């Protein structure tokens, strides 16, 4: 945990405050004459989950359990959680939501979490997609750090008006048939550029990520050896070729320009778009209803996002916490989370629910969104991410943006990114 030393130092104040808060709440309960039979669980979450409604439902049916939700920003919550478990006592919640990109880091500290296998995790494993379950499991299958919540199977959003302007099909089945490979995507991009002057995508990162996420091996093998030359270099070369030919734009993910471009109709497709992107586009481009649709992504779906519910060792109520999270992640509740907040279920039983499959979205030309994402979810491959995944991802993203924005040489940018990656890995 040496690499987390600075993080621990800078976040200790948070731990102290949370610990004091917990002590004050406990004292308040005693002075109010609260029952000793009441179990109080602190639950840390991030993002829009809809869990507050489900927690109320659970507490109504289980009056001996009180659940306190602490909702925060994603990075802050993960940093504070690691600080709390590193401190060894006080401050950590009974239940913590952990995002997929952070799971490997916390698995390195699995001695600070309860092994959910000991509480019956294997009895509920069949509820979930195999690849999702494996993401929170040790290599030998003996340790399960969390139960799966939502997932982010990827598709391809597209602007029907831009496709039509280019003289291309706009029916989602016809679009999927025309763009059924990355070679076909490239050829379609040339047509769109020629007919409209617009790129097929505004984001180099999304194009690269889409190809990367279809691979069974990406940045590291299971021995944590860097393998990018043999895996994602081809995706990088494909993306930079399209950048240099003016077929892919220059917008950086999550920057204001990326959001505003959704409303402008300045590009044709958004490859690698997961279920949660549905709401993101609506928020950034509310006046474009009916101009978007959703098709299959060329050559198979990947996954972008999703979380797990874990139980830190500092909890005094692991059995009660497990009982709650096994209920919350069950198919019935995952369906409710989808209906409330749009969290896409990781429980395939939901994919057979008639009401679920009938879900359409008027904004996306009445696309059967649940059906499309369910089909994508079942084609995702299991991928080992590695504890240093974000280091590689950040540096390759920087290289792509330098090529797109600065006109930098792709090979020089790749070599520089590899050098930066290796330098950082040596310090871990």
What is each model feature region?
Residues 1-40, 60, 419-428:
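Short, low-complexity disordered leader/linker segments with a strong preference
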Residues 36-47, 65-70, 94-95, 145, ...:
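Short, well-ordered beta-strand elements
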Residues 52-59, 103-105, 207-214, 231-323:
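Extracytoplasmic/periplasmic substrate-binding proteins
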Residues 57, 61-128, 146, 165-167, ...:
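Extracytoplasmic "Venus flytrap"/periplasmic binding protein-like
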Residues 99-155, 164, 183-186, 289-296, ...:
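Hinge/lid segment of periplasmic solute-binding proteins
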Residues 244, 354, 358-359, 374-428:
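Conserved C-terminal helix/tail region of periplasmic/extracytoplasmic solute-binding proteins
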Residues 279-282, 307-390, 412:
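Mature extracytoplasmic/periplasmic domains
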């Amino acid at each position: 945990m040496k690499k987390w030393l600075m993080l621990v130092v800078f976040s200790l104040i948070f731990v102290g405050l949370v610990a004091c808060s917990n002590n004050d709440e406990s004292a308040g309960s005693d002075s109010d004459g609260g029952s000793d039979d009441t179990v109080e669980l602190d639950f840390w979450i991030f993002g829009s989950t809809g869990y507050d409604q489900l927690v109320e439902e659970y507490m109504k049916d289980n009056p001996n359990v009180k659940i306190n939700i602490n909702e925060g920003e994603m990075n802050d919550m993960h940093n504070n959680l690691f600080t709390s478990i590193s401190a060894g006592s006080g401050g950590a919640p009974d239940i913590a939501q952990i995002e997929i990109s952070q799971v490997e880091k916390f698995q390195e500290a699995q001695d600070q979490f309860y092994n959910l296998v000991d509480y019956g995790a294997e009895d509920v494993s069949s509820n979930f997609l195999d690849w999702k379950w494996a993401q929170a499991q040790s290599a030998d299958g003996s340790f399960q750090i969390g139960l799966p919540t939502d997932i982010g199977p990827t598709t391809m959003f597209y602007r029907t008006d831009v496709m039509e302007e280019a003289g291309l099909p706009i029916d989602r089945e016809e679009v999927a048939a025309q763009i059924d490979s990355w070679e076909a995507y490239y050829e379609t991009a040339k047509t769109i550029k020629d007919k409209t002057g617009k790129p097929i995508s505004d984001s180099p990162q999304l194009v690269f990520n889409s190809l990367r996420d279809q691979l069974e091996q990406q940045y590291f093998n299971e021995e944590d050896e860097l393998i990018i030359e043999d895996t994602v270099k081809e995706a990088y070369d494909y993306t930079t070729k399209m950048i240099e030919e003016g077929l892919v734009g220059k917008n950086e993910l999550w920057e204001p320009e990326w959001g505003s471009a959704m409303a402008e109709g300045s590009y044709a497709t958004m490859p690698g778009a997961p279920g949660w992107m549905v709401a993101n586009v609506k928020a950034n481009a509310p006046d474009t209803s009916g101009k978007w649709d959703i098709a299959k992504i060329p050559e198979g779906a990947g996954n972008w996002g999703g979380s797990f519910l874990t139980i830190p060792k500092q909890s005094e109520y692991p059995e009660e916490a497990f009982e709650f999270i096994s209920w919350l992640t069950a198919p019935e509740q995952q369906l409710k989370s989808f209906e409330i907040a749009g969290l896409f279920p990781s429980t395939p039983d939901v994919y057979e629910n008639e009401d679920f499959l009938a879900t359409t979205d008027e904004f996306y030309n009445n696309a059967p969104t649940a059906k499309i994402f369910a089909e994508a979810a079942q084609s995702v491959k299991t991928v080992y991410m590695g504890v240093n995944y974000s280091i590689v991802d950040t540096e390759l993203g920087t290289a792509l943006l330098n090529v797109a924005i600065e006109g930098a040489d792709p090979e020089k940018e790749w070599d520089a990114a590899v050098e930066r990656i290796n330098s950082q890995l040596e310090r871990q």
